[in-house]
Amino acid sequence: MTENKNFEFIENEIKNNKVVLFMKGTKEATMCGFSAKVVAILNKLGVEFRDINVFVNPEFREDLKKFSDWPTFPQLYIKGELVGGCDIATELYNNGELEKMLKG
């Protein structure tokens, strides 16, 4: 089934990359302000991250929402765990927690 292949891909990406951002567009060409904001935060922190464009495949985008149980994008994963979207990433950045999570 395609869903299983998508879930397998997602699991593989978050397992094999310390930081993954499922986003609208790419880090070089963001396609929404929320994705751009998270990219800017990660860049300010000097973090290398894997970016995955959710616009490439509508079925993948829907499967990712099911996988994460999170309805919106971007979705930031650190060390295999969903951190959240733009608002949560921004809040964690502003209070210093995001940097701690990334260094730990």
Swiss-Prot record:
Keywords: 2Fe-2S, Iron, Iron-sulfur, Metal-binding, Redox-active center. Signal peptide: none annotated. It comes from the Bacteria. [2Fe-2S] cluster binds at C32. Residues 7-104 form the Glutaredoxin domain. Belongs to the glutaredoxin family. Monothiol subfamily. This is Probable monothiol glutaredoxin 2. It comes from Rickettsia felis (strain ATCC VR-1525 / URRWXCal2) (Rickettsia azadi). The lineage of its organism: Bacteria, Pseudomonadati, Pseudomonadota, Alphaproteobacteria, Rickettsiales.
